[in-house]
Structures are given as structure tokens and as C-alpha cells.
């Protein structure tokens, strides 16, 4: 579709689509599987995940885990899922009913992804989908990720971190204060900024 709109001679100059760097060869999804996400934002999450896959027509490997670091496919624990159209469909199909335990904090999943797949010379993007952060310390998370996701000799982080925030509580309970949502946004803005990624805050949870 992009080629049709921009013409067959169009070539991206900086590997950006919609402001998101798409130069990675591997992608990891870290998905909040808490009750609030699964009950109210799941269809929208599936749509966002599919849209993300679409901007990477072919990569060398994919991985899916929840915010606790639980792998969707345990047999691929610590390994890349080969990227084929069939496997992409299986990922989407399995996600529809994937309601595993979650503490509604992306920290464990991000750390597990970096520890398992951080490898020099391997371009990886982590996509975090969530709606709140129930952890204790934002600064501790940032310091830990800084330590795990080290820079190369050009000062670039080896793994990009992107994030999409789903406004579940703002929409379901608009009259209440929701500090964990604000903390999630603050955490992910800082992590994406420091790790070469993009933060997207949605304004709706409808698909």
C-alpha cells in the first residue's frame, strides 16, 4: 500500500515508517495479559500487533512473551520463532485466548527479553503493549535496562524498545485518578527515549 501511494521508485531514506524505526531484523512482543487488558483492550491490542507485523514484511525471527516474561510458545523459550506467514497466523490465533497470569507490570518481560536475546550485531526491537505499571521504582527499572541493554561502539543501544499504551482505566473509570497509568506512560516514554524507540499513547481502546 505504501508503494502504491508513494510510487514504485520511492525508497525510504531513513528506515522510518510513521516515525517508528523499522531497521530491526528481529522483533519481540512483550504483552500485558492482565484482566484489564484482556477484558477491555484485547481486540485493539490484536489490531496494533497486526499493524506492527505489517510494517515488518519479513524478519529473521519473532518472539512473544507476556509482561511476566512467560513465553507464548514454551518450546521456543530462548529461541527465535522463524518468520513465516503461517507462523504469524498461529501467533495471532493463539493470542486471542492467551490470558496467562500477569502482575500488570512490563518490567519482568522487558528484562527477560533483553537477557535472552541481547546479542552483539543482532538488531532487535522490543514492542511493549500495556495499560499500567504496578512496580515500585521507575528509576530502578531504567537503571536495570541501561545495564542490560548496553550500547555498541557507536553509542547505539543494541535493542530498541517501543511501547504502546492502552487507556483502559481512563475510559472505563474516567472520574478516578489512575497513578499507575501515569507511571506506565512516564516509564515507557523514558525507556523508549533512552533505547532508540517510539512511544505511542492511544486515545481509545475500541478496535
Region locations from a protein language model:
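Von Willebrand factor
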Residues: 20-79, 82-123, 125-129, 135-136, 165-171
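Short beta-strand-loop
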Residues: 61-94, 115-119, 139-142, 173-188
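Sec-exported extracytoplasmic/periplasmic mature domains
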Residues: 35, 50-58, 96-100, 114-122, ...
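Pro/Ala/Gly-rich low-complexity, hydrophilic intrinsically disordered segments
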Residues: 1-25
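VWA/integrin I-like adhesion module and closely mimicked acidic/polar interface patches used
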Residues: 97, 132-194, 200-202
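Second-shell loop/turn segments in exported
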Residues: 31-40, 77-81, 94-103, 130-135, ...
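Extracytoplasmic/secreted envelope proteins and their assembly/folding machinery
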Residues: 24, 42, 46-50, 88, ...
